[in-house]
C-alpha cells in the first residue's frame, strides 16, 4: 500500500506542476494543453482568464489528492482496495467540482 501512496503523491505532484504554468498565464492557446473548448480557443483573452481559473482549481484538486493519499494511508485496518477507491473518490469529487466550476466561470465571461 505504501507504493500506491507514493504513486498517488507523484500523480498529485505532476498535476501540481501542470497547473502552475496555467495559473501564471504562460501557456498560449493550443490544441494540447489547457482548458481547451471552442470559446477559449477562439478568444485568447478568455483563454488566459479561464486557464488561470482552471489551473487554480487543478492545483487545489491535486493537493487534495496528495492529502487524501497520505491521511487515508494511516487509517487502521483499511484494505488496499478500499484505500485505492477512497483516494480516487476524494480526488474525483474534487476534480469534478474543478471542471464544473471552470465551465461555469467561462460561461460567465
Question: Which positions does each model-derived feature cover?
Answer:
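Select subsegments of transmembrane alpha-helices in polytopic membrane proteins
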Residues: 51-64
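Alpha-helical transmembrane segments of multipass membrane proteins
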Residues: 19, 66-74
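Helix-coil boundary and interhelical linker segments in multi-pass alpha-helical membrane proteins
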Residues: 1-7, 73-82
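C-terminal structural segments of small proteins and small subunits
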Residues: 76-109
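Cytosolic, membrane-interface loops and tails of multi-pass inner-membrane proteins
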Residues: 28-48
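Alpha-helical transmembrane segments
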Residues: 3-19, 87-93
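Membrane-helix interfacial "entry" motifs
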Residues: 1, 42-54, 80, 84
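Transmembrane alpha-helix/helix-exit interface in multi-pass inner-membrane proteins
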Residues: 16-30
Amino acid at each position: 500500500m505504501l507504493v500506491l501512496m507514493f504513486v498517488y503523491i507523484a500523480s498529485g505532484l505532476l498535476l501540481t506542476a501542470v497547473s502552475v504554468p496555467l495559473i501564471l498565464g504562460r501557456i498560449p492557446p493550443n490544441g494540447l494543453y489547457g482548458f481547451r473548448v471552442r470559446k477559449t480557443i477562439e478568444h485568447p483573452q478568455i483563454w488566459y482568464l479561464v486557464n488561470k481559473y482552471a489551473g487554480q482549481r487543478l492545483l487545489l484538486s491535486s493537493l487534495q489528492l496528495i492529502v487524501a493519499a497520505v491521511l487515508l494511508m494511516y487509517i487502521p485496518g483499511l484494505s488496499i482496495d478500499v484505500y485505492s477507491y477512497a483516494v480516487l473518490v476524494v480526488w474525483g469529487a474534487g476534480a469534478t467540482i474543478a471542471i464544473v466550476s471552470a465551465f461555469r466561470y467561462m460561461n460567465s465571461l
